[in-house]
Design a protein with these regions (language model features):
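N-terminal signal peptide c-region/cleavage motif recognized by signal peptidases
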Residues: 14-15
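Boundary/entry segment of secreted carbohydrate-active catalytic domains
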Residues: 20-44
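Short, acidic/polar
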Residues: 38-51, 138-140, 285-288
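Aromatic-lined substrate-binding rim segments of carbohydrate-active enzymes
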Residues: 44-116, 137, 193-208, 214, ...
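Surface-exposed, active-site-proximal loop segments in enzymatic domains
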Residues: 65-85, 112-132, 169-182, 347-354
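Active-site region of glycoside hydrolase catalytic domains
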Residues: 118, 126-274, 283-310, 329-335
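Aromatic-rich peripheral "rim/lid" segments of glycoside hydrolase catalytic domains that contact
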Residues: 314-394
């Protein structure tokens, strides 16, 4: 047993010695990418990503076929060790990304004690924020994963947890005054996301000194909650925010034709509308800018790692164009959501023209258990061209 422990320590030390210290240099200039959150690994995806010209992809692999209950984790109820079969599939995808010149941000939607809602019978799993034993399991999961992936050339960042929301677990929907009072009371408790992020960075750094780490903040990485985020003492950390919304405007099933950017933006959940300019949209990220200035976080350590607007809704092209302009003006990294998503959720597949519906052959293929991807009517359209232009090589 002692021999095995010493051998393991020696292996980790040797691996650390050959880990790539230059990975942070990737982020020293603005990077533009896309999200990939599919139900399986598809090698042809990376070929298409190369042809588009993506700098990087943010992969969320939780829905990939898992040997156990939860991909890579095994069982989010009680993590013990990385599942080797799942890890082999992930490495296969990373190899494919590298062959096509696409760098990878690896993101988990599930962690021990925080199983992704869509894989949990549509129930939010908040155990991570109420019991520190799950913190320890989450840290151990990422220690093991980082030790195995730190030398892979495709990996340019770990994003340990997508859209954390301990706030919601305790009944908060917005960073209001009641939340501010609660925030003060929960310091150094399991609900303290900032402490969780600090300890997560420390855990990863115990096995991997060099790979950048991207941290999501409160309220599903909301830009408006950035005043409650705290920086970590690590010069290879980036701070992420997601879609500025308003959510009820950009979401198809909620919008129902009521709202459109920039002329009919909701002032409240079901309230009246108002017109926005690009400057008004930029105000949604004011707390991000203030965080950057207050803590001396340079622009190349800020990342808008998800933004979207359902293609079927009026205003999608104007919204996406204005957000990209805002991010580019500030030299923030960004990744649109999403590129060539598989399955029947096609509202965020911008290569499909805004008014285009899926044909009968598409639905027939799904009914027959066949691959419907070749039947998606992707093609040139004004919305897609807004994104496509961003990846043209100068």
């Amino acid at each position: 047993m002692i021999f095995r422990i010493l051998l393991s320590v020696a292996f980790l030390s040797a691996s650390s010695a050959i880990a790539d210290p230059s990975k942070i240099a990737f982020w020293n200039t603005q990077r533009k990418g896309a999200n990939q959150q599919n139900a399986q690994h598809r090698p042809e995806w990376y070929v298409a990503a190369r042809e588009l010209g993506l700098d990087y992809v943010r992969i969320l692999p939780d829905a990939w076929p898992a040997e156990g209950r939860d991909f890579l984790i095994g069982n989010a109820d009680n993590f013990e060790a990385i599942n080797e079969t799942d890890l082999s599939l992930l490495i296969e995808a990373l190899d494919e990304a590298e062959r096509n010149g696409i760098k990878v941000v690896l993101t988990m939607v599930s962690l021990p004690g925080a199983r992704w809602k869509q894989l949990n019978n549509d129930r939010d799993d908040a155990r991570l924020w109420k019991d520190k034993k799950y913190h320890l399991q989450a840290f151990e999961f990422w220690r093991q994963l980082a030790a195995r992936l730190k030398t892979h050339p495709a990996i340019v960042a770990y994003n340990p947890l997508n859209e954390p929301h301990p706030d919601k677990a305790f009944g908060f929907d917005a960073p209001d005054e009641k939340f501010a009072q609660w925030f003060k009371r929960i310091q150094n408790t399991p609900a303290d996301l900032n402490q969780f992020n600090r300890e997560m960075v420390k855990a990863i750094r115990s096995v991997d000194a060099h790979t950048p780490i991207i941290l999501d903040g409160w309220f599903y990485a909301s830009p408006r909650a950035f005043e409650y985020n705290r920086p970590v003492d690590d010069d290879k950390v980036l701070y992420a925010f997601h879609n500025p919304g308003p959510w009820q405007m950009v979401t198809y099933r909620v919008n129902q034709g009521r709202y459109a950017y920039p002329d009919r933006v909701p002032k409240s959940w079901n309230g009246p509308t108002e017109s926005w300019t690009i400057d008004r949209l930029a105000q949604q990220m004011h707390a991000v800018q203030k965080f950057s200035e207050q803590y001396n976080i340079p622009a190349h350590r800020i990342i808008a790692s998800e933004f979207w607007y359902d293609r079927r809704l009026e205003g999608a092209a104007a919204y996406m164009a204005d957000l990209i302009e805002i991010y580019n003006q500030r030299n923030w990294h960004w990744a649109f959501y999403a590129f060539r998503g598989t399955g029947t959720w096609t509202g965020l597949d911008y290569e499909i023209p805004p008014g285009q519906k899926m044909g009968w052959r598409y639905w027939q293929a799904i009914e027959q258990g066949k691959d419907p991807e070749p039947l998606k009517p992707r093609g040139p359209n004004p919305l897609w061209e807004i994104l496509q232009r961003q990846f043209e090589r100068k």
